[in-house]
Amino acid sequence: MQQGDTIFSNPDVRTILLTETNDTTLKKEGFQITTVGNLTKVSGRDGSGVIYGCRELIDRVSSSKGKLNLPEKLTDGPEMVLRGACVGLQKMTYLPGHGVYEYPYTPESFPWFYDKEQWIKYLDMLVANRMNSLYL
């Protein structure tokens, strides 16, 4: 922790501080997690970095099996600028009178495309896997 950070003295209370930083050693969308005592600080190079740092903590809590061991210092950041998935919106046949694969994206032709709950789960999965783009 840097000088000036508040260190909380109650050992029964863990505090997580989220912050954006101007640390140019972090990659774009990168983050650093530092733990001193009961204070854990998640610093992101930008807002996405803070979110990815939080996802790292969520992953560690989920896999801790009752014994939480937060890193004293962990720095991470993406190697690729664009990371994402491609969802193909096409059918296997042409529409009558058309010589190319073109379709209106209507609930009748692509009902799954309009399923809000499914999209929320899918987008959550993209964030959990540190993806930042979706190609349709």
Where would I find each of the regions flagged by the language model?
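Feature activates predominantly on carbohydrate-active enzymes
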Residues: 24-30, 35-136
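Short, well-ordered secondary-structure micro-motifs within conserved domains or adaptor modules
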Residues: 1-29
